[in-house]
């Protein structure tokens, strides 16, 4: 018998198909297509293909998600809302085109008077006020005024005007927006868990994250109003973050100065000098766009990381409180931060299965067939699965007779029906 098992195992281990041999030609040499590419090159090429496919997949996913959100929003609109949305889109496009045309005309109008206005303090003050007031949402033109400042006053003097008005204007806009939007902020804090999470992350990594937000290519005045809705951000912290990123404001001032040089001395400059000035403008714009895009990506990643840390801390606190059967206490002394943490705590309780009530803590009332209560007493507190010395154990007493009825806490005997 063991020999039969051994022979059977050997037979099963043999392959029924002939072994694959390397393809050869009639003279015994290997065919040309038999030679494979080196392993390292194949791995690197496959890795690059996977990365490109992953990037393409991410881009397509974002496009699909955005289009689906737009379609869903459009379907939820009624007739008049759709008309309003179409008119708003047309108006936005017209305003954008008009703004571009107006911006181009501004520098044509400034060319004859730029040299005269360069040393005029009144022009300096008026332009400073313009930069200050466009800090309030929904006004636009902040970047244009920065370029105009560089066009009229040069790089450094224009940057000084632009930076000082930006810091003070953004801080004032922040304070005013927070005052006006205070009720809206509290409603948003209590209902929107994403808003609450970002508000909580700004409390501990506020200055660094605010600087990253200020470096992002976001609409200036709208950004001032949006950040003001986060109650954990202090106005002075926001002003300090704006002051820290003021070197970024050298870009529009430098572009404005180069435009003036090209407009005034373009006829006298050689082709090489013109090319250098034009290339410097293009390179400066490209650096600004790339830096803004990179900072935007890093800002989103940092915000997600901080949100995960805050959620983990809140989750551990909830689990510890539930394990110890103690009520949840305030997460922070700051009331605004505590509101945000409470909103996240509710979301975490839903995720991990905790609720504000315990399904076992229910009061039971047993009635007989006539609808009369047969339990002579009811406890004021919730029901607990535990026995006292005055209560009887239903499993100890057995099934009992047909005339006996048991509640979970009290053994009640009924007289048999007559």
Swiss-Prot record:
Coiled-coil portions: none
One biological process term in Gene Ontology: mitotic spindle elongation
Chain ranges on the Lumenal side, renumbered to this chain: 1-82, 143-158, 257-274
Principal subcellular localization: Golgi
Topology term for the membrane: Multi-pass membrane protein
Transmembrane segments: 83-103, 122-142, 159-181, 236-256, 275-295
Keyword Membrane among UniProt keywords: yes
Cytoplasmic side: 104-121, 182-235, 296-418
Residues covered by region (VTT domain): 150-259
Annotated compartments: Golgi apparatus membrane
This protein's UniProt keywords: Glycoprotein, Golgi apparatus, Membrane, Transmembrane, Transmembrane helix
Entry-listed glycosylation sites: 65
Domain of life: Eukaryota
Domain remark text: The VTT domain was previously called the SNARE-assoc domain. As there is no evidence that this domain associates with SNARE proteins, it was renamed as VMP1, TMEM41, and TVP38 (VTT) domain.
Its biological purpose: Golgi membrane protein involved in vesicular trafficking and spindle migration.
Protein name as catalogued: Golgi apparatus membrane protein tvp38
């Amino acid at each position: 018998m063991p020999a039969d098992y051994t022979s059977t195992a050997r037979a099963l281990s043999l392959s029924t198909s002939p072994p694959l041999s390397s393809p050869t030609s009639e003279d015994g040499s290997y065919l040309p297509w038999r030679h494979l590419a080196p392993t390292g090159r194949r791995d690197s090429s496959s890795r690059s293909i996977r990365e490109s496919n992953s990037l393409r997949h991410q881009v397509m996913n974002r496009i699909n998600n955005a289009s689906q959100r737009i379609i869903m929003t459009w379907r939820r609109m009624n007739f008049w809302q759709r008309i309003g949305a179409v008119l708003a889109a047309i108006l936005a496009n017209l305003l954008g085109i008009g703004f571009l045309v107006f911006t181009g005309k501004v520098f044509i109008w400034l060319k004859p008077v730029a040299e005269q206005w360069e040393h005029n303090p009144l022009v300096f003050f008026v332009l400073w006020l313009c930069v200050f007031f466009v800090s309030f949402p929904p006004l636009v033109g902040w970047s244009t005024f920065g370029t105009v400042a560089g066009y009229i006053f040069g790089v450094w003097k224009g940057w000084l005007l632009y930076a000082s008005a930006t810091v003070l204007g953004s801080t004032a806009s922040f304070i005013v927006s927070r005052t006006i939007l205070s009720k809206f902020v509290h409603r948003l804090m209590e209902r929107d868990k994403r808003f609450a999470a970002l508000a909580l992350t700004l409390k501990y990594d506020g200055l660094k994250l605010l600087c990253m937000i200020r470096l992002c290519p976001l609409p200036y005045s709208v950004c001032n109003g949006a950040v003001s809705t986060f109650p954990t951000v202090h106005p002075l912290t926001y002003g300090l973050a704006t002051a820290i990123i003021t070197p970024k404001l050298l870009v529009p001032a430098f572009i404005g100065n180069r435009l003036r040089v090209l407009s005034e001395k373009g006829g006298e400059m050689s082709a090489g000098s013109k090319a250098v000035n034009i290339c410097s403008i293009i390179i400066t714009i490209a650096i600004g766009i790339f830096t803004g895009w990179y900072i935007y990506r890093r800002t989103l990643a940092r915000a997600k990381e901080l949100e995960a840390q805050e959620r983990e801390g809140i989750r551990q606190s909830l689990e510890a409180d539930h394990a110890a059967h103690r009520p949840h206490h305030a997460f922070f002394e700051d009331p605004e931060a505590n509101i945000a943490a409470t909103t996240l705590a509710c979301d975490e309780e839903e995720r991990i299965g905790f609720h504000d009530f315990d399904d076992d803590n229910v009061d039971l009332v047993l009635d007989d067939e006539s609808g009369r209560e047969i339990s002579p007493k009811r406890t004021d507190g919730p029901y607990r699965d535990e026995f006292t010395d005055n209560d009887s154990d239903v499993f100890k007493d057995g099934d009992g007779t047909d005339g006996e009825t048991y509640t979970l806490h009290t053994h009640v005997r009924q007289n048999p029906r007559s």
